Amino acid sequence: MKVTFVGHATVLLEGSRNVLIDPFFNGNPVAAMKMEDLPEIDYIIVTHGHGDHIGDTIELAKKFGSIVISNFEIGLYLQKKGLDKVHTMHIGGRYDFGDIKVKLTPAVHGSAIVEDGEVIYGGNPAGVIVEMDHRKVYHAGDTGLTKDMELLSNEYIDLALVPIGGNYTMDIDDAFIATKMISPKMVVPIHYNTWPLIQADPQEFCSKVSEIDIKCRVLKPGESVEI
């Protein structure tokens, strides 16, 4: 499986199917890929309703005919926006789509959708585990540190994508603790240096992770890793 860090929290998984997580392109100052450069997208996963995560879901799902996976409330919102291939889930649920398996995991954050100045309830935020081609990728979404992450060690994660930017999510210290609890084979930091409020040094994070014998890769926007 090829995992590409598009920028911010947007990640592309390419294998037997193509999966796009939190597709934020328009307005993303660090996005290293344009929407027109994407391959065919089979699945879009939205971890929560904030604009930098739900992003361009509607436009891309209509373009590719993608199945969109999110929580129940966001799913209803997207259906009202004209999407008919929406699969709703909730935290703790796992579903086998035949070619991929998806599980939503707890995240501690918000999930409101803001539209024309109005706040729309977006259910509970989530992280997600995607299983494809005998590999498991965990995308934490936006979250603070939580003891629930200890349970993720039972999932035998191949690659964890964790936010390190602080302010709205875990900072480097908390992301390090999370990584110890998750115990993945490899970790990649995300959700940092997009705006001044979430400045962080990914090399500092990887330096801490090196102490616990877990591989850490800093991916610049547009770079990929094979797992």
Q: What feature does the model see in each segment?
A:
Residues 1, 62-67, 135-137:
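Short active-site oxyanion
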Residues 12-50, 55-62, 73, 110-120, ...:
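Pre-active-site segment of Zn-dependent metallo-hydrolases
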Residues 79-93, 176, 180-227:
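Binuclear metal-ion centers of metallo-dependent hydrolases, dominated by the metallo-beta-lactamase
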Residues 27-28, 50-55, 75-78, 93-96, ...:
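Active-site environment of divalent metal-dependent phosphoester hydrolases
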Residues 20-23, 41-49, 69-72, 138-141, ...:
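Active-site neighborhood of phospho(di)ester-bond hydrolases with catalytic His/Asp-centered motifs
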Residues 55-113:
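Glycine/small-residue-rich loop that forms an oxyanion/phosphate-binding "nest" at active or ligand-binding sites
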Residues 1-20, 25-29, 96-103, 204-212, ...:
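Zn-dependent metallo-beta-lactamase
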